Amino acid sequence: MINFRGRFGRPLWHYLVLPVVLLLLAVILLTPMIVQTESTLKIRPNQQGLSLPDGFYLYQHLNGRGIHIKSIIPENDSLVVSLEFPEQQMQAIEVLQDVLPAGYAIVASESKKRHRLLPVFRSNQQNLG
């Protein structure tokens, strides 16, 4: 019979339990940080002749009512407003409906966004050479 004993006379699996438990604990604790839901509002004109609203104008009104904004980005004939807190999405829609004139569609969406813990290791062509 083969005796698999470690250096101090304990079975080898005793030495593997602590690293495995620590690894599982790290995965459980870091998963919410890596995958977060991001709440966005997409604003686009419904009628011909309407242009996109000014992002700074929207920012002033949303910020004035206590809604925290991550970013406001133009994208494919629409304006995408990323909110800091998903809980404020309905309140932001109400503010935008009050501020914007008729003819704009406001579509809410939530997406899971992956954050990189170590952005240094991203494959970036500019860093090569």
Swiss-Prot record:
It is a single-pass membrane protein. One of its GO terms (molecular function) is protein kinase binding. Residues 1-14 are cytoplasmic. The chain crosses the membrane at residues 15-35. Belongs to the MzrA family. Interacts with EnvZ. This is Modulator protein MzrA. It comes from Yersinia pestis (strain Pestoides F).
